[in-house]
UniProtKB/Swiss-Prot annotation:
It comes from the Eukaryota. Residues 1-111 are annotated as: Disordered. One of its GO terms (molecular function) is protein kinase inhibitor activity. The keyword Lipid metabolism does not apply. The keyword Membrane does not apply. The lineage of its organism: Eukaryota, Viridiplantae, Streptophyta, Embryophyta, Tracheophyta. Keywords: Cell cycle, Protein kinase inhibitor. Probable cyclin-dependent protein kinase (CDK) inhibitor that functions as a repressor of mitosis in the endoreduplication cell cycle. Residues 24-37 have a biased composition (Low complexity). This is Cyclin-dependent protein kinase inhibitor SMR14. Residues 74-83 have a biased composition (Basic and acidic residues). It comes from Arabidopsis thaliana.
Amino acid sequence: MSKIKIFHLFPDDKDIEATQQPESLLVPSKSDSLDSSLSRHHQENQSNRQRNHQHRQQDQELENLQDGSRGKRKWECKDEESPVKIPETPRNSNSVCYCPPRPPRKPKAIPSMKRRGMWVKRSVVFLDVAREVESMFPPSVLQDFGKKIKKARF
């Protein structure tokens, strides 16, 4: 005969508790205990709060069961020669889910050194030549032209 290995999955204690108490996961909302003297609007709000609280509890129980029972299950190999226990671990138990890194930022535009150097070298000086021009044309000469000469500003 050829060697045949048989594997059996043995549940953890938490799995057994969950299978024995399925009503803990599904809890119907009962509004019989509400006082009849309360207004209808108040009763609706209170029942909504109870439902939300129950849903949160159910979600927490499910998460605890799923997280706790994943890594604790064991596979057992029944072989004639050597019984071996192999712990089952989830695929991504050691790795932590990280958000992807942000894309690199676009660098700010820096004016090139060539252009900046040109502005530094060109020390531009604006000269006020209005006085020199007026000195070239005295007021006595301007009266002869009939005030046809006008000052222009740049």
